[in-house]
């Protein structure tokens, strides 16, 4: 298999873990999910350089899926010549509802002082919005995320693919991903069971 550099993304609670599994079970590909150390949303030169080195120094390329890659994609495209970006998109209301259930008393999307909302390590991995409620902020995050990835797709139309989360459950959807990544037919992974929403991350 040719050298393959892949960044996967999506808002989180959108099928990113399932995407990593679909890619990573293809023959000859190792695809991780949210490999550490995670990049914060705001640019950190040291952490960025470490992730970049993982891509540049691996003889077979590298593949990782993490929602927090979005603000760094333009920089990655400048630094990685053969980069492919895959983004999964789940319905806005489903992402908001899932995050509301998943995060409890944490609020990653609004600035806070730790009284109403608990401080959480993941706070640094998300952008902040001037919302009046947590669910409103998550909705604003969804809007920002998919607006931005579509702008990046317009800049790199051959190297960015956005797929609906549901496509991970279909042969047609998985073939679209494999075709985009130029994975040979014999190396492709076809799961017996479908991916279910409760497994989305």
Identify the function of each model-found stretch.
Residues 1-60, 189, 196-201:
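PAPS-dependent sulfotransferase catalytic core
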Residues 9-10, 63-69, 88-90, 164-166:
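Short His-Asn-centered micro-motif
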Residues 23-25, 76-82, 86, 178-182:
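Short, surface-exposed basic-aromatic patches at helix termini and helix-loop junctions that form
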Residues 79-102:
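Conserved phosphate-donor/acceptor-positioning beta-strand/loop module used by diverse small-molecule
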Residues 16-20, 39-41, 71-73, 93-98, ...:
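Short catalytic/ligand-binding loop motif for oxyanion handling, primarily in non-cytosolic enzymes
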Residues 29, 60-61, 83, 158-161:
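Short, conserved active-site loop motifs that form the nucleotide-linked donor/cofactor pocket
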Residues 36, 41-43, 92, 151-201:
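The conserved 3'-phosphoadenosine-5'-phosphosulfate
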């Amino acid at each position: 298999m040719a050298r393959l550099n892949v960044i996967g993304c999506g808002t989180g609670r959108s099928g990113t873990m399932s995407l990593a599994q679909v890619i990573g079970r293809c023959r000859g590909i190792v695809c991780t999910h949210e490999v550490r150390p995670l990049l914060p949303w705001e640019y950190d030169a040291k952490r960025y350089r470490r992730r970049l080195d993982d891509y540049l120094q691996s003889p077979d390329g590298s593949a990782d899926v993490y929602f927090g890659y979005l603000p760094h994609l333009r920089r990655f495209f400048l630094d990685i010549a053969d980069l492919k970006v895959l983004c999964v998109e789940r319905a806005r209301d489903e992402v908001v509802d899932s995050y509301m259930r998943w995060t409890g008393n944490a609020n990653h999307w609004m600035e806070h002082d730790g009284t109403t909302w608990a401080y959480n390590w993941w706070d640094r991995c998300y952008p902040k919005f001037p919302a009046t409620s947590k669910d409103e902020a998550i909705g604003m995050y969804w809007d920002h995320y998919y607006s931005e990835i579509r702008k990046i797709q317009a800049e790199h139309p051959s190297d960015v693919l956005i797929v609906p989360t549901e496509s991970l459950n279909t042969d047609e959807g998985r073939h679209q991903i494999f075709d985009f990544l130029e994975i040979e037919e014999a190396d492709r992974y076809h799961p017996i069971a479908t991916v279910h929403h409760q497994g989305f991350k």
